[in-house]
């Protein structure tokens, strides 16, 4: 995949041909969802945020827009779209949802469902000052290059975990966010 440019049609056909495997039984019962926004361009981008340094949890970390499901959300997809609107002003109607990835258990006790959606290139992002300190775009082909992610094995709360680490410009991409991007790369058939 690194040998040639990845265009949006290639990404969409590969994503739709390779459906996520059914997920294992969830360790966590509290539900959350994140939007994995792919920017519609000839060479698509992946939209990411950097969380505010003032937040109690995951302060300053690179993340996808998203959060906990609340009682106004009819579905996990609705939760991801609501959170994306609250955090970076992406209107729900501007997102073309193309699917979901297998849920991921977070260290904070949530089962997080990544919702993959295509967004227009001309959206004007407006970061919520309470939650987001930066919004940036990474070329999708670069984000999906498996060789950019490095494993770190840790022992936490009595369990062994593997987390993935990477840099993009001055942003440190790691943990769940790097794991979701890596899962997306594997989903479309990227090879290490």
From Swiss-Prot:
Matches recorded under CDD domains: NUDIX_CoAse_Nudt7 (cd03426)
Cofactor(s) needed by this chain: Mn(2+); Mg(2+)
Gene3D superfamilies, per the entry: Nucleoside Triphosphate Pyrophosphohydrolase
Record PROSITE patterns: NUDIX, NUDIX_COA
EC numbers, comma separated: 3.6.1.-
Family under the similarity heading: Belongs to the Nudix hydrolase family. PCD1 subfamily.
InterPro entries: CoAse, NUDIX_hydrolase-like_dom_sf, NUDIX_hydrolase_dom, NUDIX_hydrolase_NudL_CS, Nudix_NudL
SUPFAM superfamilies: Nudix
Record-listed Mg(2+) binding positions: 83, 87
Biological process per Gene Ontology, one example term: nucleoside diphosphate metabolic process
Residues spanning the signal sequence: none
Keywords for this protein: Hydrolase, Magnesium, Manganese, Metal-binding
Molecular-function GO terms, alphabetical: coenzyme A diphosphatase activity; magnesium ion binding; manganese ion binding
One Pfam family of this chain: NUDIX
Species this protein is from: Klebsiella pneumoniae subsp. pneumoniae (strain ATCC 700721 / MGH 78578)
Protein's name in the database: Uncharacterized Nudix hydrolase NudL
Xref: HAMAP family: Nudix_NudL (MF_01592)
EC category: hydrolase
Domain Nudix hydrolase: 29-160
